[in-house]
Curated annotation (Swiss-Prot):
InterPro entries: Ribosomal_uL29, Ribosomal_uL29_CS, Ribosomal_uL29_sf. One of its GO terms (cellular component) is ribosome. The lineage of its organism: Bacteria, Bacillati, Mycoplasmatota, Mollicutes, Mycoplasmataceae. It comes from Mycoplasma capricolum subsp. capricolum (strain California kid / ATCC 27343 / NCTC 10154). One of its GO terms (biological process) is translation. This is Large ribosomal subunit protein uL29. The gene is rpmC. Coiled coil: none annotated.
């Protein structure tokens, strides 16, 4: 799978590689932002994006060694990446809030009978615990 990705990357032009690299870096920034806020569900994506960036950097260095000019500056749109991260984060937080509310609702619906608690307490008091006499010296 990685070999096919590298073949695809090697076929791209330098400009396309740089654009892809910057967009992946922006995506990584957004994912790290989500992780810091606590709204990242797919934590494995950070590792995948880092590997993809490394593959792109390798392809760029191969092109640089072959004599192509790779010193071009193309800026990524970090604002767009952050907006997408915030949108995804809001969805995740809403999902988490809904789950917690459901759990709380289920727990609060379970009613405990006070008489049952008293019976259990009395039964526990009536049980006698025998002391351990095996370790004592005479």
């Amino acid at each position: 799978m990685a070999k096919s990705k590298m073949l695809d990357l090697r076929n791209l032009s330098v400009d396309e590689l740089i654009k892809t690299n910057e967009s992946k870096r922006a995506e990584l920034f957004a994912l790290k932002f989500q992780a810091a806020v606590g709204s990242l569900e797919q934590t494995h994506r950070i590792k995948e994006i880092k590997k993809e960036i490394a593959r792109i950097e390798l392809a760029l260095s191969e092109k640089r060694l072959s004599g192509e000019n790779t010193n071009k500056v193309i800026k990524a749109d970090y604002n767009k990446a952050v907006e997408e991260a915030e949108k995804a984060g809001k969805e995740v937080r809403a999902k988490q809030r809904k789950f917690l509310e459901e759990q709380y609702g289920q727990q609060s619906q379970t009613k405990v009978n006070e008489a049952d608690i008293q019976k259990a307490m009395q039964a526990a008091e009536q049980e006698t615990v025998e002391p351990d006499t095996k370790g004592e010296t005479k």
